[in-house]
């Protein structure tokens, strides 16, 4: 009985080790992008406060660009505050953003826009607050 139990335990340990390694390999195969957030409001506009999950608050003045590399394949929540307005969006969403080299974000008067080629932008979040 002891030999069988030792045999079973050693196989369970080996199987667990293999599963952990397979999971690690699978996660490293996923290409995670660089994120670039660019304030393109206007030169006369007040700076925008941006809060990204796990990062300090960033103050972006006109034409400022903030960038970093995604390190985990999970949703990254973001909030931008501009005067009495706010907008919430996913700076990174694995279901749509993984596999792209760069995720470009523009902060504009209409809201937050995303592009993967830095040419074609799509609205991802509208400002919420008092009317413009």
Could you say what each language-model-derived stretch is?
Residues 2-73, 77-132:
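Intrinsically disordered, low-complexity segments enriched in small/polar residues
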């Amino acid at each position: 009985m002891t030999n069988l139990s030792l045999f079973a335990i050693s196989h369970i340990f080996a199987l667990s080790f293999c599963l952990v390694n397979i999971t690690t390999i699978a996660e490293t195969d996923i290409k995670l992008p660089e994120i670039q957030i660019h304030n393109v409001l206007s030169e006369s506009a007040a700076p925008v406060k941006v809060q990204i999950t796990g990062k300090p608050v960033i103050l972006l003045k006109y034409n400022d660009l903030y960038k970093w590399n995604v390190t985990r394949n999970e949703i990254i929540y973001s909030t931008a505050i501009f005067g009495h307005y706010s907008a919430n969006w996913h700076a990174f969403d694995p279901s749509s953003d993984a596999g792209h080299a760069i995720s470009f974000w523009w902060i504009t008067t209409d809201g937050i826009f995303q592009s993967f080629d830095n040419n074609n932008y799509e609205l991802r979040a509208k400002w919420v607050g008092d009317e413009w």
